[in-house]
């Protein structure tokens, strides 16, 4: 490579390093907000879990209609986080090949349409730019309810484990019938209203979606920060490598020019 080619390559890598460093800083500043949203959403979902555990709510052993809600986002540059949830969703479809799928996020939508387009019945995008809100989750839950009743609903999402780890996970969202047939629902002092199971199911679904989106958002921000950190380190190593190559090539050019000058001067003598 010529000296100019090496110099151009070196400038390009330095620009990439600036971009990845900036993205890492942005991800780091968003991490605190993401963790607060995740902690808040966990409190809602854990409240639901305690309620249904006490009521001994369960899904039917043989479900005629199953819905899988796969939660991801629209943004990339965050490692394998989207492909992992797509892989887990496909594994679920191996168990229930006739299940309907709702995708939340363009990334999971694109991956599922490539392999299971006939299963995808509804998709949402515009998610993952900011920490999710209850209002967003409620709007999504309302649209999902318009699909009709399902015997079994499972929410697939990336669970935040630590700053360097996440894992594809799943939790159920119960149908009105499952709630109504809970063996110990009578232990709660609920009003005699036929709409209560439906209301509880809707709130539970909203909380499940909110928590899945919040966990996924925190996992994604963490994964992006780590990916940009690794990219910055790799760029730094390449900068050192090309700097050494540039200096050696430059020294060789100078040496050759000196040899030419000395040779020319000698021939004049």
Curated annotation (Swiss-Prot):
Membrane topology of the entry: Peripheral membrane protein
Keywords: ATP synthesis, CF(1), Hydrogen ion transport, Ion transport, Membrane, Mitochondrion, Mitochondrion inner membrane, Transport
Subcellular location: Mitochondrion inner membrane
KW Protease (keyword) present: no
Statement: the UniProt record of this protein carries the keyword Transport: yes
GO molecular function: proton-transporting ATP synthase activity, rotational mechanism
Main location: mitochondrion
InterPro entries: ATP_synth_F1_ATPase_gsu, ATP_synth_F1_gsu, ATP_synth_F1_gsu_CS
Function: Mitochondrial membrane ATP synthase (F(1)F(0) ATP synthase or Complex V) produces ATP from ADP in the presence of a proton gradient across the membrane which is generated by electron transport complexes of the respiratory chain. F-type ATP synthases consist of two structural domains, F(1) - containing the extramembraneous catalytic core, and F(0) - containing the membrane proton channel, linked together by a central stalk and a peripheral stalk.
Family assignment from sequence similarity: Belongs to the ATPase gamma chain family.
The name this protein goes by in its record: ATP synthase subunit gamma, mitochondrial
Species for this entry: Pichia angusta (Yeast)
Organism classification: Eukaryota, Fungi, Dikarya, Ascomycota, Saccharomycotina
UniProt gene name: ATP3
């Amino acid at each position: 490579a010529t000296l100019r080619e090496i110099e151009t390559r070196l400038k390009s890598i330095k620009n990439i390093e600036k971009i990845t460093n900036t993205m890492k800083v942005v991800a780091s500043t968003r991490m605190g907000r993401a963790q607060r949203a995740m902690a808040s959403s966990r409190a809602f979902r854990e409240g639901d879990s305690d309620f249904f555990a006490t009521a001994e709510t369960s899904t039917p052993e043989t479900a005629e209609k199953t819905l899988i809600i796969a939660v991801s986002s629209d943004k990339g540059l965050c490692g394998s986080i989207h492909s992992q949830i797509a892989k887990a969703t496909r594994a679920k479809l191996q168990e229930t090949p006739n299940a309907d799928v709702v995708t939340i996020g363009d990334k999971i939508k694109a991956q599922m349409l490539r392999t299971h387009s006939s299963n995808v019945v509804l998709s949402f995008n515009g998610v993952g730019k900011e920490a999710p809100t209850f209002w967003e989750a409620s709007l999504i839950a309302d649209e999902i309810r318009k699909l009709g009743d399902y015997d079994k609903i499972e929410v697939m999402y990336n669970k935040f484990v630590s700053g360097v780890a996440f894992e594809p996970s799943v939790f159920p969202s119960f149908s009105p019938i499952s709630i109504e047939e809970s063996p110990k629902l009578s232990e709660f002092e609920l009003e005699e209203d036929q709409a209560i199971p439906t209301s509880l199911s809707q709130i539970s679904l909203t909380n499940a979606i909110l928590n899945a989106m919040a966990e996924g958002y925190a996992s994604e921000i963490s994964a992006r920060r780590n990916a940009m950190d690794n990219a910055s380190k790799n760029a730094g190593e390449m900068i050192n490598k090309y700097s050494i190559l540039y200096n050696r090539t430059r020294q060789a050019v100078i040496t050759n020019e000196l040899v030419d000058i000395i040779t020319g001067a000698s021939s004049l003598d």
